Regions:
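N-terminal, motif-rich segments that launch catalysis or mediate targeting to/interaction with membranes
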Residues: 20-132, 146-261
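Transmembrane alpha-helix/helix-exit interface in multi-pass inner-membrane proteins
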Residues: 142-143
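Bacterial Sec-dependent N-terminal signal peptides
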Residues: 1-28, 261
Length: 261
């Protein structure tokens, strides 16, 4: 009986590990890396104001909140804020807008509510948590992908022989395969010269969206339906993932410093 209990225990650990490593949530790790890098580049004033508003919760921890509430029907109206679609060769400014909102509209609405002195503390906290997440989404190229394939979700591929889709490969699979915690990865990525930081933080939300869109077109050309992706794909593309995480963190810091610093 004792041996049976031990076997059941280790089977449970295996299932739990599998579930963790196949997280649907950039995955949780990616968003937390963006939040952690951003926190490291806040001004003293912004850091103090944010810590007071979030009551000690770190940006890395709140970065996944917008995904955690997705299953709650009360928050379904925010679903369209996680992505933005515009046609190939078309700039966001001139394209047709989603009447339900989109990633760029969502970011701007968060900024508006947070900066409004009349907004309640509860609303500021809620929209701040969304903002932290949405800036991360903006830097995952396929969150600016094509509507017809739902940002690569409809492009079925294999990742190390496991069935998945192209969106998930860029959201979480490559990051999880790198096998670092968010603190390890953020520490590994958080190095910039003064000039590099200034160059990355230059521009507007729309500029950054158009930049991600250009990357998305490259991502679409990187794989076909039913492709078997593994080490070579990781070698060719993980540098882009790391670059986008770094950009997301520094740009989130810029946005938050403007709001709170």
């Amino acid at each position: 009986m004792f041996r049976v209990k031990i076997l059941v225990f280790f089977l449970f650990l295996g299932v739990a590990s599998f579930a963790t490593n196949n997280s649907p949530f950039w995955g949780q790790t990616g968003h937390r890396v963006v939040g952690e890098i951003a926190y490291n580049h806040l001004t003293k004033k912004a850091k103090k104001n944010l810590e007071k508003l979030l009551k000690g919760e770190g940006l890395a921890i709140v970065s996944t909140y917008a995904d955690e509430i997705k299953s709650d029907k009360a928050y379904r109206k925010f679903s369209a804020w996680h992505y933005v679609n515009f046609k190939d060769g078309e700039a966001y400014e001139t394209g047709e807008k989603n009447p339900k909102g989109d990633l760029i509209q969502g970011i701007k609405e968060c900024q508006k509510i947070i900066s409004n002195p009349a907004s309640s503390e509860k609303d500021k906290v809620f929209y701040l948590k969304l903002l932290v997440h949405l800036i991360g989404d903006l830097h995952q190229p396929l969150h600016t992908g094509r509507a017809e394939d739902r940002g690569g979700n409809a492009i079925k591929v294999n990742w190390f022989r496991g069935k998945t889709n192209l969106h998930a490969v860029w959201d979480s699979k490559m990051i999880e395969s790198y096998n670092m915690t968010y603190t390890e990865l953020s520490t590994n990525l958080d190095y910039f010269s003064k000039n590099q930081k200034a160059a990355i933080q230059k521009g507007t939300i729309i500029d950054w969206a158009n930049e991600s869109r250009e990357l998305a077109l490259t991502v679409y050309g990187s794989a076909k339906i039913n492709d078997n992706l593994s080490y070579r794909y990781m070698y060719d593309h993980f540098s882009t993932v790391k670059s986008q995480l770094k950009k997301g963190g520094l740009r989130l810091a810029k946005v938050l410093n403007e709001l709170f610093g």
